[in-house]
């Protein structure tokens, strides 16, 4: 099962899923990331 949560350490407006995904994978060491309503959300196992 996976859960999504707001990436508090992501800076700025989330325009592209690629930048959010990169942040979640490389900075937060989570599965992936996507933009929702201009915010970056990371996906993790829960």
UniProtKB/Swiss-Prot annotation:
Matching entries from SUPFAM superfamilies are given as:
Scorpion toxin-like
Q: Which organism is it from?
A: Pisum sativum (Garden pea)
Which Pfam family would be a valid example here? Gamma-thionin
Instruction: State the PROSITE patterns in the record.
Output: GAMMA_THIONIN
Entry protein name? Defensin-1
Q: Respond yes or no to whether keyword Protein biosynthesis is given for this record.
A: no
Between which residues do disulfide bridges form? 3-46, 14-35, 20-40, 24-42
According to its UniProt entry, the function of this protein is described as: Possesses antifungal activity sensitive to inorganic cations.
Which SMART domains does the annotation name? Knot1 (SM00505)
What top-level branch of life does the organism fall under?
Answer: Eukaryota
According to UniProt, the tissues expressing it are described as: Epidermis and vascular bundles of pods, stems, roots, leaves and wet or dry seeds.
Question: Gene3D superfamilies of this UniProt entry?
Answer: Knottin, scorpion toxin-like (3.30.30.10)
Membrane-crossing residues?
Answer: none
Q: Name one GO biological process term.
A: defense response to fungus
């Amino acid at each position: 099962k996976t859960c999504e949560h707001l990436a508090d350490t992501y800076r700025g407006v989330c325009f592209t899923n690629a930048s959010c995904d990169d942040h979640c994978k490389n900075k937060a060491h989570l599965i992936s990331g996507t933009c929702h309503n201009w915010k970056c959300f990371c996906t993790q196992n829960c």
